[in-house]
Amino acid sequence: MGNVNAREEANSNNASAVEDEDAEICSREAMSAASDGNHVAPPELMGQSPPHSPRATQSPLMFAPQVPVLPLQRPDEIHIPNPSWMQSPSSLYEEASNEQGIPTMITWCHGGKEIAVEGSWDNWKTRSRLQRSGKDFTIMKVLPSGVYEYRFIVDGQWRHAPELPLARDDAGNTFNILDLQDYVPEDIQSISGFEPPQSPENSYSNLLLGAEDYSKEPPVVPPHLQMTLLNLPAANPDIPSPLPRPQHVILNHLYMQKGKSGPSVVALGSTHRFLAKYVTVVLYKSLQR
C-alpha cells in the first residue's frame, strides 16, 4: 500500500511539472512573436489550448442583453401630437367664449328612444341629437337673439312639444317657437320698488299698520296692459308714425280703444306675433243694432 501511494504522488508531480513546462513554452513563444511583430499563433496551437490556459476558461455573463432602441431625436425633430381631447380647458373655454349668443336649453319630456331637433337657426340643415337626462332629453344651444321655428324628431317622426309656444304653417305642420331676446326691463319704474330704502337705521320703527294701509285697492289690470297699440298717443295726428315693438305681455289679447271712436263705433284690436313680425288686427264694430 505504501509503494502504491508513493507511485501515485510521483506521477502527479511529474504531470504538474510537464504542464508547467508547457505553459512556460507557450508564454515564451507568445513573447517572441510579439517582439517580432508576428501575431499569428503556431499551427499546432491554433486548434487546441493548453491546460489552465486563459483561452480555455469562459468568462461568465456579467451584463443582461440589451434591447435595441431607436436613437434619440434632436429637439427640432421631435413631433408631439396634439389631438383635440388633449387640449387644455382654458383653450376650450376661449373657443366657447368667442361664440356670441344666448345659451338656451331645449328639453323634450314626452318619451322616446332617439330624439333630435332641427330648426330655422341654420335653415333646417342639420339635426342635433338630444342627450338623455333622467326621463327627459335635453340639449344646450348658443343662438343669437331672434325668433326661431324648430321641431323634434322622435324615433324618426316629426313631433312638437304641446306645452311650448307653437305655430302652424299653410300646410298644417306644427312647429315650436323659440323667442330669444336680450333681456331689457320693459318698465323701468316697476323695478324701483325693489330698491333698498335710502334711510338710516335709526329712522326705522315697529309701529302697527293703520287702517289707511289696508284701504288702498290693487289695480284692476296690470299697468303694462294699459298701454296697448290702440291707445298710444300719436306725435302728429296727420302723419302716421311707425308703431313701436309691442310688449310680449299684450300679445294674443283683445283690447278696446279708449275715447277715440265715435259714440256709435267701438274699435277692438289684437296683436299676434309670427317669427320676428307683429301683426295687429283692428275691428271696428257698430254699436247700433
Swiss-Prot record:
Cellular component terms (Gene Ontology): chloroplast; plasma membrane
Keywords assigned: ATP-binding, Carbohydrate metabolism, Cell membrane, Fatty acid biosynthesis, Fatty acid metabolism, Lipid biosynthesis, Lipid metabolism, Lipoprotein, Membrane, Myristate, Nitrate assimilation, Nucleotide-binding, Ubl conjugation
Annotated consequence of substituting G2A: Loss of plasma membrane localization
Chain residue ranges for the region called Disordered: 1-59
Tissue: Expressed in leaves, stems, roots, flower buds and flowers. Not detectable in siliques.
Cited CDD domains: E_set_AMPKbeta_like_N
Region (Kinase-interacting sequence (KIS)): 103-180
TM annotation in the entry: none
PANTHER family per UniProt: SNF1-RELATED PROTEIN KINASE REGULATORY SUBUNIT BETA-1 (PTHR46316), SNF1-RELATED PROTEIN KINASE REGULATORY SUBUNIT BETA-2 (PTHR46316:SF2)
Binding partners and assembly: Subunit of a probable heterotrimeric complex consisting of an alpha catalytic (KIN10 or KIN11) subunit, and a beta (KINB) and a gamma (KING or SNF4) non-catalytic regulatory subunits. Interacts with SNF4. Interacts with FLZ1, FLZ2, FLZ8, FLZ9, FLZ10, FLZ12, FLZ13 and FLZ14.
Name this polypeptide is given: SNF1-related protein kinase regulatory subunit beta-2
Species: Arabidopsis thaliana
Taxon lineage: Eukaryota, Viridiplantae, Streptophyta, Embryophyta, Tracheophyta
